[in-house]
Design a protein with these regions (language model features):
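NAD(P)H dinucleotide-binding glycine-rich loop of Rossmann-like/cofactor-binding domains
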Residues: 111-194
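Residues in the short beta-alpha loop(s) of Rossmann-like NAD(P)-binding domains
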Residues: 220-221, 281, 305
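Detector for the Zn2+-coordinating histidines of canonical Cys2His2
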Residues: 4
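C-terminal hydrophobic helical "lid"/dimerization subdomain
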Residues: 263, 307, 311-358
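Mid-domain Rossmann-like dinucleotide-binding core that forms the NAD(H)/NADP(H) cofactor-binding site
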Residues: 157-241
Length: 358
């Protein structure tokens, strides 16, 4: 080394790469039993074959209430619930749908290749997952979902009405199964619906559309009874105060699914009649097997809907088959925690509350 030169040690320079701020969105989160909170959550990341929806309207389902009460071990605290949705495509990872399109869809994400999917009975897919259960749901500003689960919303259908597709399809599927089992046209049947929640109300409206005149709904909430009488133009009664007549109905829909309603259904059904078990509040059974056997009662179960049912329901909603839907209540997403509390306390006449994130 030259005597007049000095060794210069190289310096270690740290290059700081600026970190992009994570995109967040507002969501209604199930935080613990009987508690919902508005919190920031990560914005969905677009994946191949999926879309990111801007949620325009989302309904509170009875199963969301069940989770809210801490009665569904599959839906754990920290989850964004909500599966009755309508929205606009914000980002698309598929050529099937483009940003800006209005859609609703099937919250059941099915495999497409099992025996039930191939039969068109994809509601029974053994490999199914579900929005608002195994992946974040629609109580949020945005949600990701596979594009194959989506159904286009026609221009003459509002997004609030489109958000009723899922529960209305549940009613349609149950009624379709029942009509196959009935021994006479449903228009000629005397019909009893147990429970005047969203499924009971939608079933009553659809049965009226089908021409059923002799229709009665049993509901304990006086506000809901009044709404059902007004919008479905049918008879109602309080089953706590008034007993349903025995052996009187050709068709009974149990939209509650509790021990007491199962017993009521079995007592009310006529020989040769059909009981459709829709609700599942509990599953302990005290069915009168003697009457079931000797009176040739048909007892049916139902689970959600098929893709065909959802598509048919969108068409029915667009044709106003469920009426003007003025009984539906709309609130902002920020009002979601209070909406859950009001539904829990029976303080709203609305059988369906829709939350609006924007």
């Amino acid at each position: 080394m030259h005597p007049h030169t000095s060794q210069v040690k190289p310096s270690c320079l740290m290059v700081v790469i600026p970190r992009h701020k994570e995109r967040t969105m507002k969501a209604l989160v199930y935080t613990q039993p009987n508690e919902m909170q508005i919190l920031d959550r990560p914005h969905p990341i677009l994946a191949d074959g999926e879309v990111v929806l801007k949620i325009e309207s989302v309904g509170i389902c009875g199963s969301d209430m069940h989770a809210f009460h801490g009665h569904d071990p599959r839906r754990k605290p920290g989850l964004v619930l909500g599966h009755e949705f309508a929205g606009t495509i914000a980002e698309s990872g598929t050529p099937l749908f483009a940003p800006g399109q209005r859609v609703t869809g099937n919250p059941l994400i099915t495999c497409g290749y099992c025996e039930y999917c191939l039969q068109g009975r994809n509601n029974l897919c053994a490999n199914r997952t579900m929005v608002g259960m195994t992946r974040p749901g629609a109580f949020a500003e945005y949600m990701s979902i596979p594009a194959r689960s989506l159904i286009a919303v026609p221009d003459n259908l509002s997004m609030d009405a489109a958000a009723l597709t899922e529960p209305a399809a549940t009613a349609l599927h149950a009624i379709n199964l029942s009509m196959r089992a009935l021994q006479r046209p449903i228009q000629e049947c005397r019909v009893l619906i147990l429970g005047g929640g969203a499924i009971g109300m939608l079933a009553a409206l659809l049965l009226k559309h089908y021409g059923v005149d002799d229709l009665t709904v049993a509901e304990v909430n006086p506000l809901r009874r009044k709404a059902i009488e007004l919008h479905a133009s049918c008879k109602t009664f309080n089953p706590i105060e008034e007993k349903s007549p025995e052996n009187s109905y050709e068709f009974v829909m149990d939209c509650v699914g509790a021990v007491v309603t199962r017993n009521t259904a079995m007592a009310a059904i006529k020989p040769g009649g059909v009981i459709m078990h829709v609700g599942l509040q509990d599953w302990s059974s005290e069915i009168d097997m003697r009457k079931l056997t000797l009176a040739e009662i048909t007892l049916l179960g139902t689970y959600t809907y098929s893709t065909v049912d959802l598509q048919a329901t969108v068409s029915l909603l667009a044709r106003k088959a469920f009426g003007d839907l003025s009984w539906v209540e709309k609130r902002s997403l920020d009002e979601g925690p209070q909406a859950f509390m009001d539904l829990h306390a029976g303080k709203t006449a609305a059988a369906k509350v829709l939350l609006k994130p924007f």
